[in-house]
Design a protein with these regions (language model features):
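Charged, solvent-exposed interaction patches on well-folded alpha/beta domains
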Residues: 2-183
Length: 183
């Protein structure tokens, strides 16, 4: 027959210590300082990326704010970003930060200029293309981006129902404007 007496005494002693510690905490004799939440402060989603049949929402700082089962219609989709994993409530660690920076700059300009752009694609060589309806908008590299987006706002309503390619990579000769080729 095994002796259980010492084990029971140890368990009882531990229980008494736990009760004493809880009493000291509850009465305020011992104060516990809790570590603040280390997750980033999440803000309103401004874009989304598609990932494993889900639509992951991103804020302006590339924090993943949530996920949806269907594609949002009020914010643009961002494509061209490379990453290993995605965790809701965490910052999206991209392999090419400059590509992500340019993509989010375009997203910011889309919102500032109240444009209805469906998708923003930035390639590894940092050239951007945006899509809306049947229009492909070639933005090129991050050069005069804010000015280009402001120009787009000025004539967006005139072209948004068309089908073709709007080349905004640079102004045409003699600064007459951007070129548009219908399909």
């Amino acid at each position: 027959m095994k002796r259980r007496g010492p084990i029971i005494i140890i368990i009882a002693a531990v229980a008494l210590l736990v009760i004493a510690a809880c009493t000291l905490v509850l009465t305020g004799v011992i104060k516990i300082k809790w570590k603040k939440d280390a997750s980033p402060a999440l803000s309103k989603p401004v874009a989304y990326i598609e990932y494993m049949h889900s639509f992951m929402l991103l804020d302006k700082d590339l924090n993943v704010t949530g996920s949806e089962t269907s594609a949002p219609t009020d914010i643009p989709k961002v494509t061209g970003l490379s990453f290993d994993k995605i965790v809701v409530g965490s910052h999206l660690d991209v392999k090419n930060p400059e590509t992500a920076k340019y993509a989010m700059k375009l997203v910011d300009c889309i919102h500032k200029n109240s444009l209805e752009i469906a998708e923003v694609y930035v390639s590894a060589d940092q050239t951007a293309t945006m899509y809306v309806g049947d229009i492909k908008i070639l933005m090129g590299v991050d050069e005069s981006t804010e000015e280009k987006m402001h120009d787009l706002r000025d004539f967006f309503d005139d072209v948004k129902g068309l089908n073709g390619v709007l080349d905004m990579q640079e102004l045409s000769k003699n600064n007459l404007g951007y070129s548009f080729k219908t399909n």
